[in-house]
């Protein structure tokens, strides 16, 4: 186990290059199953979720080469279709391998996937889509079995623009005969990145980013080299930290378009925003202003993965803010920890009503999930005294080295091993 010790009272200043995207890397690693050869991914983040995904790939028979610059995956000799409970139970992104293994072998077996405890994240849309592609789905206990003798392209209208369901359908269908159409598809930048990689391998995918994606099945894919986009949530987290500490931080290597709704909220909170090429700079005011209403939504709406961090910022903003979670029903656990620091937050159904306070006090708090840990770090940076965040190991799932990054900006933060 590990704890983070965060010292408050420092304004963050400086610039950072942002790591590769976690949410783009994981489905891309799964996509390497499909080409029966070599996939080389540059700018792949050194985080525990990627580590675990690569371990799953090794267990399936892939050869992995990893350097500080790239990850190389050779799937030419893989022959296993059964995903071990050891990895799948703790990592939800293992679900992407369902579509990839079905696309390559026509069968897959895995336990229900895990991940952060932030509410129900059912995969019924994934399984229903597979059944429309002539795939047999059987759920026995806590294990899922899928198989097909002849996968076929088909039409899908998602009741919700799920990123995972969209990506799984894409992975399963690129080698399926015929045409597959996904209506109400997810528009996230990470979905676009997956499609760009697959097209570079020889897939025939159109419409990514529009909400209506069409995939024309091809017979084979080939080797590819790809460079990952930077992580928009990591970038937004550091910009939020700048806002919270009356700081001045520039993040580099990111597209402002991917951060549009976050930047709009930060501007409403009184921040100065400067965009130049692939650089975004946020200058925080002496006192943040409240935001009357924020709703989380799928892209291009405000990202649920930034809800906790913005809640932390608003805990010291002048006035009353309302933050409504529409994506996950149980993502307010961090509010209870912020209240231990003196925050005034009331949860009403799916809305957090945040009354800004004059100051937060450093104390001992507990991390519950990845983004909640980042939120507690931001709160610690704002607080008087030191904040100790226990169970902070979650942060390694999405941030390469948050301590080193924040220290570059002038923060006082360190990790301490416990137990």
What does each model-found stretch correspond to?
Residues 1-419:
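Short, structured segments at the rim of ligand-binding sites
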